[in-house]
Amino acid sequence: MGLSKDFIESFLIKNGTPIYNSCSGYVGDNYLEEEITNRDPRLYQIVDNNHKPYYVRNGVRDLNEAANRVGASKSVTGYDCVKFHHANTAQQEARSSSFDWFVYRYAEVLLINAEAHAELGTCTQEVLDKTINKLRDRVDMAHL
């Protein structure tokens, strides 16, 4: 399993415009590095890539050994998700992780809250400021 191209294309350019806008500054999609250049920083944090370092327990940056993995844990779409992957390839392949993974992050709770307000027709600027705009502030994205 892997992330879809539609999912990747849904991320805005850092200036807040969609990639299909001719003035967006979209670099292109010949290589993964091009696709994630100048995009919403959260995309770079989600998609596993050769340049993404892992931070290990002692705080030392380690090379991303997992980005070069092959076999069952490598994405068939070419867009591998960082979530639930471990930098140690042997542990990842064995499916014997001893780490406590987060299932719901606070960011997801905020997004669920905003979506519920949108579905109920009660989404106001105040709701956006308490949910989505809080997340956008963390990565210096423009407010909605």
Q: PLM features: residue spans?
A:
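Acidic/polar-rich alpha-helix caps and helix-coil junctions
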Residues: 1-144
